[in-house]
């Protein structure tokens, strides 16, 4: 099964309620920061098929689109024609799901269901890890989560987890995918950066795109950092 690099990056954090006066973090990428404490990131759990997290990638969703196209492709009735599944725009998938003919919409719906089961399985395995077992909420970002198709896939995975009596809450980050990582960078930057500057040039390298922008620092306790 051809998986691509994960487009969904899940980082578990714990919000700090107090910060020692005059605390200065001197290491970029430090775990202990004024607003948050980074507990776990980049889980490299593997099995015989490779990295488990790759099954929750945008590439995995495209794989399921292709799988659901095969029955119609075999009889020459693929509604997507010769278009590669990996190159179908998210907006086109959203439009087909909402207003497309029944078979085209059914392909998208089938891929959503298949991907949701895969995502729920990945999250269950992650939540068994020591660093994840106490997670109260998992927040999804990235371009896939910003589409209606992505929202439904994540929402369906959340329902599947609830059916397994898993209490960890599943949310989608409220900021636009192009802005979310840049906003978060200000909370992960070392404090010395803001001793003489009001903002930083943040860079977000995702699974598909690279984004850069000016990010101002604000206390995590004064903003709605989650939905």
Which role fits each region the language model picked out?
Residues 2-227:
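ATP-binding/phosphotransfer module of carbohydrate and carboxylate kinases, centering on a glycine-rich
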């Amino acid at each position: 099964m051809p998986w691509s690099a994960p487009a969904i990056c899940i980082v578990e954090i714990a919000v700090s309620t107090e910060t020692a006066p005059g605390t200065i973090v001197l290491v970029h990428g430090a775990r202990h920061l004024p607003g948050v404490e980074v507990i776990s990131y980049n889980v490299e759990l593997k099995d015989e098929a490779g990295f488990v997290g790759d099954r929750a990638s945008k590439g995995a969703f495209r794989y399921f689109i292709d799988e659901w196209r095969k029955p119609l492709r075999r009889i020459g009735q693929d509604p997507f024609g010769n278009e590669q599944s990996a190159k179908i725009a998210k907006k086109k998938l959203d439009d087909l799901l909402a207003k497309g003919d029944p078979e085209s919409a059914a392909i998208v719906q089938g891929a959503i269901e298949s991907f949701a089961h895969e995502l729920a399985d990945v999250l269950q395995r992650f939540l068994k890890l020591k660093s994840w077992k106490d997670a109260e909420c998992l927040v999804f970002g990235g371009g896939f989560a910003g589409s209606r198709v992505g929202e439904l896939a994540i929402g369906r995975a959340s329902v599947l987890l609830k059916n397994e009596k898993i209490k960890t809450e599943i949310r989608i980050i409220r900021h636009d995918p192009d802005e979310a990582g840049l906003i978060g960078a200000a909370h992960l930057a070392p404090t010395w950066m803001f001793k003489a500057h009001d903002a930083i040039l943040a860079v977000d390298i995702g699974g598909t795109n690279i984004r850069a922008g000016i990010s101002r620092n604000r206390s995590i306790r004064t903003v709605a950092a989650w939905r």
